[in-house]
């Protein structure tokens, strides 16, 4: 996605150069942690979780929590429930036996994230229509959950301890609407050095 900037008269007679590309390969390994918050049990008919590389599943084999469908703060997101449990969806003449895929998006479903890679773009609508899901395994089997606000915040480039205001939905909207802080920092540093 291109970014456009207008610098008014600050750059008259000067040439702005964007920072050099960073060559490190970002991934989600140090960001996404085990948590059963909002997790839903995934059965083999929902998705064959054994097809996901073992290193991509966040595990705590001592944990014996199960999904909590009664506590509104711990219930799986309704969009996750639909994408994980509804079968045989037809879209533009193509039948999808399930609506989940690992490491890539399908037009009608959600993506089980590959923590070895960077995240797809986080947008403000993730609060009401999440499409990126974390694969989990504990004593009771396999689960999926949405990315949590603290994880989304770090994916977007905010420090782990950065404070947001409002409830969980407002946090996600703020994160999704934000320009990544590392990008702004590099641009400002280049502006200052002009």
Residue ranges and their predicted role:
Residues 21-194:
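C-terminal target-recognition/interaction regions appended to catalytic cores
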Residues 1-13:
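Rossmann-like dinucleotide-binding core of oxidoreductases
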């Amino acid at each position: 996605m291109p970014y456009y900037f207008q610098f008014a008269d600050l750059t008259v007679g000067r040439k702005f150069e964007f920072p050099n590309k960073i060559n490190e390969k970002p991934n989600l390994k140090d960001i996404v942690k085990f948590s059963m918050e909002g997790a839903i049990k995934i059965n083999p008919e929902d998705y064959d979780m054994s097809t996901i590389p073992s290193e991509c599943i966040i595990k705590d084999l001592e944990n014996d929590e199960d999904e909590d469908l009664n506590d509104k703060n711990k219930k799986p997101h309704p969009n996750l429930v639909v994408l994980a449990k509804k079968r045989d969806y037809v879209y533009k003449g193509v039948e999808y036996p399930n609506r989940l895929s690992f490491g890539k998006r399908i037009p009608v479903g959600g993506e089980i994230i590959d923590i070895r890679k960077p995240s797809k773009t986080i947008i403000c609508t993730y609060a009401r229509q999440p499409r990126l899901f974390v694969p989990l395994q504990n004593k009771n089997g396999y689960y999926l959950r949405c990315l949590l606000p603290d994880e989304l915040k770090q994916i977007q480039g905010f420090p782990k301890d950065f404070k947001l205001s409002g409830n969980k939905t407002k946090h996600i909207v703020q994160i999704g609407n934000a320009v990544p802080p590392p990008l702004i920092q590099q641009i400002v540093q280049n502006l200052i050095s002009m």
